A protein has these predicted regions:
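Intrinsically disordered, low-complexity polar regions and short flexible loop motifs
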Residues: 156
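Short, flexible loop/turn segments with low-complexity composition
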Residues: 7, 88-89, 186-198
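Catalytic cores of eukaryotic secretory-pathway lumenal/extracellular enzymes that build
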Residues: 45-46
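Active-site-proximal N-terminal segment of extracellular/periplasmic enzymes that hydrolyze or transfer
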Residues: 18, 161-169
Length: 206
């Protein structure tokens, strides 16, 4: 009873064989769109199970979001380790409040992904992309084309309804937030073969 069990994974289900990402056979991540390597939820979203006797209520559920960087500070807090020092700043935040039901660290928080390289086979959401999630909204920016997609994840978890044209203000806000973050962390981005110049940041195209 003094053991904490955490079950999770690092990405969506693998479906990289030709035809698996965009055909009827692609169902293992339902209702999420696409799979591993995709910027869509099917590539970045995973369920998690935590067993912690006396802390996590058995059978309870939580629909809040977090990211893998959050596990480091959370596990240290679980172990009761305080006042520790790290070589670099910690990117994650502890999700202990979610486990205890005392708060929600995702409120007002943005999560970022940057995949500037070509990965595996083609398919929905596959290719050099960067994206940001804030609250209900998720913005995906395609480096190769400059295209942006906006989804309300709460209402459209399958990401089938791109509402970027209906909400240009949200697209602009999230593009700015994403571009600012990528510059801050010196994020990589592709370059044009013809000129060797880097493609625009998401907030340089509207």
């Amino acid at each position: 009873d003094n053991t904490i069990v955490i079950f999770m994974s690092d990405n969506g289900g693998l479906s990289s064989e030709p035809g698996w990402r965009d055909g009827e056979i692609h169902t293992q991540n339902y209702p999420l769109n696409s799979g591993k390597g995709s910027a869509y939820e099917g590539g970045v979203r995973e369920p998690m199970i935590v067993r912690w006797p006396g802390v996590v209520k058995p059978g309870s559920k939580c629909d809040k979001y977090l990211i893998i960087e959050d596990f480091y500070p959370t596990i240290l807090e679980m172990a009761g380790i305080k006042g520790y020092k790290t070589v670099q700043p910690i990117d994650g935040v502890s999700f202990m409040p979610l486990l205890k039901g005392t708060g929600d660290p995702s409120v007002g928080r943005s999560l970022f992904w940057n995949c500037p390289n070509i990965w595996g086979n083609d398919g929905p959401g596959i290719g050099p992309t960067c994206s940001v999630r804030n609250g209900d909204w998720k913005l995906i920016y395609y480096y190769e084309t400059g295209k942006k997609e906006l989804f309300n994840i709460t209402e459209d978890i399958g990401e089938h309804n791109d509402v970027a044209r209906q909400h240009p203000d949200i697209v602009k806000r999230l593009s700015g937030e994403l571009g600012t973050y990528l510059r801050k962390v010196d994020g990589q981005r592709p370059s044009f073969k013809a000129t060797g110049k880097p493609v625009p940041w998401p907030d340089e195209i509207y």
